[in-house]
Amino acid sequence: MSKLWLLLLLVAAFQAVHSYPAAESDYLEEPETTWDILKETWGKMKDHYLNLGKETLAKLKELKENYKTWGKEKKQQFIATLKDKLCTPQDFEEDIDYAESDEDKDLSFTMKVLLILKETLDKLKAAVGEEKEKLIQEVKGLRAKICDKLSDYEEEEEFELEEDYEEDPETTWGILKEAWGKMKEHYLNLGKATLAKLKELKENYKTWGKEKLQIFVAKLKDKLCTQQDFEEDIDYTESDEEKDPALTAKILLKLKEYLEKLKSAAGKEKEKLIQKIKDLRAKICDKLSDYEEEEEEEEEEEFELEEDYEEDPQQTTWGILKETFGKIKDRWSQLTKIQLQKIIQVLKNRYCADQNDFEDDVAESDEEQGGRQVIQKYLQKLKEFYEKIKAAVGAKKEELKKRLEETRQKFCAKLNAAAEQNDLEEDEDEERGWLGKLGKGLKKVGKKFVKKMSSAMKAGCKKGMKMLKDNAVKVTPLVCEEKTCKTLVTILTYSCGMQYTITRTNKATYLEVAFIVNGEVKAKKNVKLGDVPSCVNLGALLGKICLKGIEGKGKSSSGQANVNFCLAILADKYNVGCKFCASYANKKFKVLPPKMFSGAQDDNGEILQASDNGEDGILLDADEFEID
């Protein structure tokens, strides 16, 4: 490979390596484990370097083509000019002249190389301390290498760029690979140090009693959650009475590190850091509030480091979702079991005990009879029998009494069976709630809710069905990392990236959705599972995009309950949409391929999926699928 081509690659690689932010700035941006942070950082680095590599390669190819058109004299003039500008000044940072004179204008290639070096020096100006000294030494080293190469070129009579430059190991990629190795080693060392600190905190925490732990939580909450101006009012100095709970100071010092990094940030980066600090503060305050309200056993579960922390260093999105839905499922199951047990116990005490005054009890008020339809029917039947018995005489009365006792026994058998059930299915109540919210015209067909669509909706859906048939809409499968899943949606020739992050509070589950167009976040929306759809506007090309979070319940093939959830999006302008669904059951998490559909919004803002014939609208739900 030509020496000149190697020189240019070295220059481009140097620019790429030093254009990435200092490693320390990203290390503690997310309040997750060390491994989560490292994984996210490496992902960002990889994307960043790949983009830089593609841009650099495109520039180099363009320069290569221009270079081929030069004659020998022009090439020699280029080498002499480059060497004169780069290698003769004593003070490299001050003496490089970036303005082209008249005789230099033809040598645009020279100036482009120098501009790359100028960008590197501009970045050097923002560095301070040891980092700046290190960068200066690297710049001087690179300068010396380039000057040596230029001296070699003057001695050569002819040189041409070789076609196999991409195969040479000393390319941008080779240099980047070496840089990644150094970064990886740096992060691993940081991770080990952090893990050692976490282990130390864990051991200290185990030695605390309940009273000391409560004092720690109260003081931490008071310092962190009551100040109006978080950046100005946090006091990082410990008073004498605060020195015992050392964890308080350590957590606050960690937050102080965030704020120190914030001071050196600017523009969008600063706004991003401020938002992350506020989010972290809110999460910590929520945890502290939960901790004060829970029992001692729940307190230990909330704050104690998990034993399998070291065994699972790479917690994925699925692990986080699995834990989230597990907690939601447990809470739902516990609440329904308690409610059911109360209803059953009241009814059993009133109607199923061996009492002589059973007939009097039947005639009493129904206020305590509960709300389940099957139980109400039996109670009504018992009352009807009792009314007939009072009016009957002789053999007829005895027959009615016998039938009354048989009905009572069946009724009590139903109660006993209900008491033995582990799960309570409440689909009928949920369906009634949906019907009330969605308005008139909705009917149930099988397991789906169907609604007649207007002529305009039908026409729009048929247009959307044609686009899907013509493959004018494409959606990539979800790619998940950490708490965030990403996909790319392409409609005609317009592309839009979408990513969502799942978050959970004590009362609800949310999907934080962001739309990215041309590398910039165009819109954001928080979607609560179960809420009515909400929309964002992505401009004239893509138009209004509506979103809905859906949650459903079902059973796996083994009979165990599972939770299904979907994020549905609808491009209103094109009448096409897509559902991204997942399920958690049997301690397994599964993501399904995206499902595209043609649809529209009704007058209530609800997203309807067009039926196969395009005449009816089907209410979106969480798909039922099994995990074995």
From Swiss-Prot:
Instruction: Please give the tissue specificity annotation from the record for this chain.
Output: Expressed by the venom gland (posterior main gland) (at protein level).
Q: Where is this region: Disordered?
A: 290-313
Q: Which GO terms describe its molecular function?
A: toxin activity
Composition bias of kind Acidic residues appears in 291-313
Which residues does UniProt assign to the signal peptide? Answer: 1-19
Q: Which residues form the propeptide?
A: 20-368
What is the name listed in the Swiss-Prot or TrEMBL entry for this protein? Venom redulysin 1
- Originating species: Platymeris rhadamanthus
